[in-house]
Every structure is written in C-alpha cells, then in structure tokens.
Amino acid sequence: MLFINTDLQECLNALNLEFDEHKELVKLVKNNSFSGFASTVVFHLKGVNQKETAQQIAAWLLKHKKAHYRRVFVANNNFINFEISPQKYLDFLKTKPTFAPKPTKVLIEWVSANPTGELHLGHVRNAFFGHVLNNLMVFLGFQTVREYWVNDYGQQARVFGFSVYQALHLQQNIKVTPHPDGYEGELVDSIAKTITGIPLDKLSFEEFLQQPFLDQLLADCTAKVLEVIKQDLATIHIHFDSWKFESQVVKETDYKKLLTQFKDEAHYEKDGAIWLKTTLYGDDKDRVLVRQDNRPSYFGTDVAYHLDKAARGFDLLYDIWGSDHEGHIKRMHCVYEGLKIHQKCQLKITALQLVMLYKNKEIVRLSKRAGNVITIKQMLQMLSEDAARWFMLSQTNNSIIKIDLDTANLQNSSNPVYYVQYAYARMCSVLKVVDQAALAQVNDCSLLTHEKEIALLDQLVYFKSLLEKVQVSHELHLLTNYLYETATLFHSWYKACKINDPAQYNLTQQRLLLLQSLHHVFGQLLQILNITAPQQM
C-alpha cells in the first residue's frame, strides 16, 4: 500500500474521523494546477466541513509525519496535495521494489480453447493476458498454478471428431455430406492420416455418436490437437503446469451427490432435465445442469470443474474468458454463492473482447471451422511478439483490439513498444560506464528539483501501489500505460537535463541514482510483460 494511504488512515483514526477503508484515498494526478499525489478523502467523510477538515489533516500530517513530506497543502477544490520530502524519495531510490512471499494459493485458468484446431489471433489476447497476470502474481509473492481447461467432452469436440472421420472418407474418394458446423483445413486432414482401424461406413453424425470407436477417436483427436496447441503456446513463451480434461472431470462427478450440496429448493426436475434454480442467487433465469440424455450441459461441466478447483485447496481462482462467455459469469458466481464456496475460495472472472486484424484496410474474418484463420505462426510473420503483446495488453479489457500491421511494425517513436524499449536501452547505455561503488555511497537526492525529476520520482513512488492495484482490478493496460508515461517523462528529462555533468558531481550522482532506479523498474515491468528489454538499439 502507498505510504501516503497508511499515513492518511493513521491521521483519520487520530482525528476520530470515520471513513471507508476500501476507498482509494490517494491518486497520482497530472493537471495544469498540480502534478503529484492528491487525496479527495474529505469528500468521503460525512458531516464535516470539507475545507476545515482538509486543513486539519494537512496540519496533522506535517506535525506527525514531517519526515515524509516537504509540503502538504489544501487546494481550492479541497483536494489535499502532497509534496514528498527528499528524505522519503531517497528511500525509494535506495530500495528495490520487492514483495514478501504470501501463503495465498492461486489457480489461474486461461486460454482453454477448444481442442479443435490451432490457436489463432482470437486466442492470443487471452494467452498474453493470463501469462502476464500470472507473472504479476508471482512477482507479488503469490503461489500460482497455471491451468488449461481442455474442453474435450462437449459438442464442438464431437463435431471435430466427426470432421476427422469424414476426412477419412474424402481421402479415399468417398463422398460424404459434411456436418453444417464441421471443420476443414490442413490440421483435420493431417490428423485423419494418422487414424487407422475405423470402418468407413458413411455414418450420419447421430450414428457416429453411437459407435464403439467414438471415445478413442475423440481422445486421439484431442491428443493430436493439444500437441499443436502446446507448440503454439511455446512459440510465444507460454507454458502451463496443469492440463485439466473436461471428460475426466465429468467421469469423476456424481451429479446426484453434487445436488445434495445445494439446499433442496435450489434444484428441480423439468422436462426430463435437472435444473439449478440460480434465480435464487440473482441470475436472470434458471439453468439446466443435466440434460434429458443424462449428459451434463456446458454449464453442468463448468459447475463440476469449478467445484473441483475449490476442492483442491486454492484460496483464489482466476478465470480468463472470451467475451462470448460474458453471460456465463453471473451464473458461475451464483453457484459459488449457492454453495457458500465464495466464503473460503474467491472467484474472479475476466472476460476479454475480440481482436480484429486490419489488412488492406479491411477486417480479416476469422473462422476456425473453415480452416481460414490467422494462426500464431502466421501472426509472428507479420509482427513481432513484443509488438503483439504490447498492443493486446495496452487497452481496457472491454475494448475490442484493432491492430493495424503498418503501425505495429514501425521502428520509431510512433510505435509505443519501440519508444519504451528505446528508453530502457538509453538507460543501459548510460549505466554501463557508471562507477557502481560510488553510486552506492549516494545518500541524498535533494538536488533533484527539476519538474521532470520530481515527476519521475513520483512514478517510482507509485510503482508498488500500481502493481497491487492491477492485481485487484485485472486492468493490465495500466502497466503499459505506466511504462509509456514514464518513458515519455524519461525522454523529455534526458533531453532537458544533462545527466552526466562533470562540473556538478553531486547532482550527477543523484541523477544517476534516479536513472538506476528507473532502469530497475523498467526491467521488472518488461519482465512481467515478457517483452524484450534491449541493452542497446
């Protein structure tokens, strides 16, 4: 937590002022009147004169926390503004930001694309997001497990298996009527060439589902596709600790026993199906758990999976889904509330919007079934992984990502990832000739008074608080925003101030100390984002 927040909470307690501890008390602001840390805390206090109370708080902080602040003052709008003392800035310059290990066990499940083809551009945003979230959680000290949920039981897996079955016929020049939602492409054909021992009887889809070879064929198809998916993920430096199979979870789930965990009025039978009365917990309608054919619904398998997650002793569960699953979020929270799991195991679900690729000023339509997709390998031929990561992580979760390849491939300051990497390379260039022993002896930063230096110091102060905020909000674009804003400040400072000035030794050493701290923070963030941190450019 930002030390100013801690100081404010102590102050409010001392002044007997009631406040909501969950409110964000302090923000880093940048406007024409003031740039730095400011608080609107008095706006959240009931029954007080805002101006007088703000002045009381400022006076208390200057008296009891004098070492932390050069100045605390109340603006005309009753914001409390903070100017941090050189002594406190020095603490941040001399201490590398780290986090102690936490006992919290976290399961992060992401990507989880159906095993029906290669991963494509539509999956990459999810892949990068989950990867960076995991990196962040590890950096913050959490114990994480990375999991991929293999949807090998549902209708899509069956249709894919049927498509492979039909490809077997086509390879023998036997005409068949394709499934209306069937899959095509090189992967389907290549898998079909590995399948042997299956009679070619031109079965309908319904007949296909009754065959004794069905389970083995679907398992073989899933295994082949997962080999490709794992290779795709390794190409973009993503690996998982656990691969959880839907078919296995369904096999191990006793749905009658599962129902006993809900109160009696929370489930019922209707039209031969078993329903969960999720409306009891705020859902807009009840949901089918087990269908008339005794197969669990998509919702039913997800319920079983999430109960399995909770049973494994995790304290915090993260689900990273696509926007097409957004309507599913509410009902999963309803299940956790109905079983009171949320009291011991917190569930957080993030739904990410689509990715759109522009080529020749037209949107490229993606369709895995038609075999006409932009695969990960093809994407990496069109833009670098660094650029792909940046552009897919730099917008809010509910924003549709629109990538213009010309912009993403620019090698100048118009390309934000290039701009940030160039800042890091500049820092490396300066630091490689610095006397580290002399720099370690610097115990003052009072000469850092340029407005750009104060702004950069504030960015350093804010860094740990930012990471904690992102861990709670899942808004990973705040990380790229921070890097870009700090890079902009750095480049302007580099241009405005002579960092290495032999005529001003003490000022030079203090500026080098600032630069070294920036270099460390940039390195940590680029590592979390898994974006290359170049030593030179």
From Swiss-Prot:
NCBIfam families hit by this protein: argS
A GO MF label: ATP binding
Transmembrane segments: none
Family recorded in the similarity comment: Belongs to the class-I aminoacyl-tRNA synthetase family.
Top-rank EC class of the record's enzyme: ligase
Key word Nucleotide-binding present: yes
Record's catalysed reaction(s): tRNA(Arg) + L-arginine + ATP = L-arginyl-tRNA(Arg) + AMP + diphosphate
Stretches of the chain forming a coiled coil according to its record: none
Disulphides: none
Organism for this UniProt entry: Mycoplasma pneumoniae (strain ATCC 29342 / M129 / Subtype 1)
Subunit structure and binding partners: Monomer.
Gene Ontology biological process terms, A to Z: arginyl-tRNA aminoacylation
Assigned GO CC terms: cytoplasm
Protein name stated in the entry: Arginine--tRNA ligase
